[in-house]
Amino acid sequence: MSNHIETKCIHGNLDFSWDEPTKAVSFPIYQTATFGHIGLGHSTGFDYTREKNPTRQHLEEILTALEGAYDTTAFSSGMAAVTAVFDLFAPGDHVICSEDLYGGVTRLVNTIGKKNGLMVDFVNTGDLDEIKRVLRPETKALYIETPSNPMMEITDLSACAELAKEHNLLMITDNTFLSPYLQNPIALGADIVIHSASKFLCGHNDTIAGFVCSAKEELAAKIRLIAKTTGGCLSPFDSWLVMRGIKTLAVRMERQQENAGSIARWLTEQKKVRKV
């Protein structure tokens, strides 16, 4: 029996989220750089926090449950997560991106990406014909924000996933603006889901973080290698802050939808407002 999303926000897919062996109800912050070994060549599974940390791992397990992913890697910011995903590509590879993207992503692909030989086209991904128009043999992926930041443009993820599968492309989706509470891109065919956790996931404006949720084992292994090698990992304390924030994700999203509906209804009654 699968857990409801409210339960996953607190426990992930576990029966409980107590720390072993302490049984701490609030998962501890393992604020350490290194971990001792039981004996020579006998690791506990944790060696160095850049590679793996219990607090961060617990948070990653919660995101994996929320997004229905194979695995999740936590990063020090949303842009660190995006950068790790673009590190999957080689010079000469081509990526098709939504024309309306978060400015940091646009800057990344137009500067560092271009310097490293990445080719990018920005199109209206809500129009499949526009995507097909720029397809080329070097195309490796679709990169989609829906709703997009900042113009809230919408893309049909299922339709794009079918197109991506037809052309053997990676389907990458930024799910920051809807969160797992309202949308699960992997269930709609995405291979990779990205989050900037400083928005709805954390919800308290007190930290920044990013996630890459991978649908398949091979992709997950590549992302973890990039994270371990480049070092953009999320700290134990920030992992705990995001974990705390996610506990209230469901109730916050419900109230935010209610508030948005109230504002929209009020605006429709204003004579000076033409369209809502």
Kindly give the residue locations of the regions a language model identified.
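N-terminal "arm"/small-domain region of PLP-dependent enzymes with the aminotransferase-like
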Residues: M1-N53, L59-I62
